[in-house]
Amino acid sequence: MSHAVAPFKRRLRDALESDSLPMALGRVLPLLDGRRREAFHGRDFPAEQARLAAIRKRDVADGPRLLQQFTAVAEKAGMVVHPPADADAVRETVAELLRQASARMVVKSKSMATEEIGLRQALEADGLEVVETDLGEFLVQIADELPSHIVAPALHITRERAAELIGSVTGQDLPPDPDTLVRAAREYLRDKFIAADAGITGANALVASTGSVMLVSNEGNARLCSSLPSLHIVVAGVDKLVATMTDAAATLDMLPASATGQTMSSYVSFISGPSRSADIEMSLSLGVHGPRDVHVVLLDNGREAMRRDPMFQTALQCVRCGACSNVCPTYQQVGGHAMGHIYTGPIGLLLTSFHHGMENVAGPQSLCAGCGACATVCPAGIP
């Protein structure tokens, strides 16, 4: 299934001629980078960067073994792990799981892997109601647009437009006040969480030694998507495989500070199987207060080819923090819709060629100034 991505020249022209985009970028990007600088104040960033880079490099190189280990441990714990596949196969696997569950309504947390393969659009075409529950993704869904930033998908949307978008689905005349808009979105989405037949999330890490899925979020929506419905489907790239909890913790040491300037995100969850209880005579029952069924659907879609490419394998070290976009002088002028395809900003220039083809990266690649600002802030040491 193709993504509804406009031609590069049109996206670039729209960005340069936009009246609202400079306002949105000017409000948010300096704030994000300022928070990142403050979060790392007093820390030895080069040393921490080198440590995470070494861990990510080792785990990427050891990917095939980690895949076998994760699959064995996760399935022993009661999850079903689907082997790595391309975009078409992953979409069909998820659709079939939802058909088998007779699901009609799905809640979804923010996931670049699902954006990469156009999963929501495919499921909607299959007749399902799919609701993005991350506030930024919710705004982008209402606007019928694509995310413009890896961490802040609605970064290009001003608060004034956000009020119009949320009001269009809630039927309210809302002021451009962030707190008011968040409350309105919360009230609207709460019923969706309760009614959902299935929840779809991504993963920030897949821990091979424990068979665990790590989820990191601030809004709490990922936890609701993964715990309220009876079916939880995880869609994750094989690049998310890490060897141990120690390796996952190394990502946690750097990801929140690099992405949002936090010491730690509000919610960190490790999911190691379906909800269970043995409180009645030690007889195991699944599906207590959380899902009865947990499926991990793994995505390759060019990742193994990237892992084997000595020039590009370091791109798999990416932890999806978006810091490179925040300091990129070109991104600061034109945003992610022009400087990117599905994956935006500097890292998107590397990933797009493998995930979506060289034809979709040629235009955005021409915007790179070659200044190297991205490398100075990358927590995983991608040059």
Named regions from a protein language model:
Residues L286-A315, T330-P383:
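Ferredoxin-type iron-sulfur electron-transfer modules in oxidoreductases and energy-metabolism complexes
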Residues M1-P310:
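The feature marks the mature, well-folded catalytic cores of soluble enzymes
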Residues A89, S266-S275, R320, Y331-G335, ...:
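A glycine-rich phosphate-binding loop feature that marks nucleotide/adenosyl-phosphate handling sites
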Residues Q313-N326:
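Short, cationic low-complexity segments
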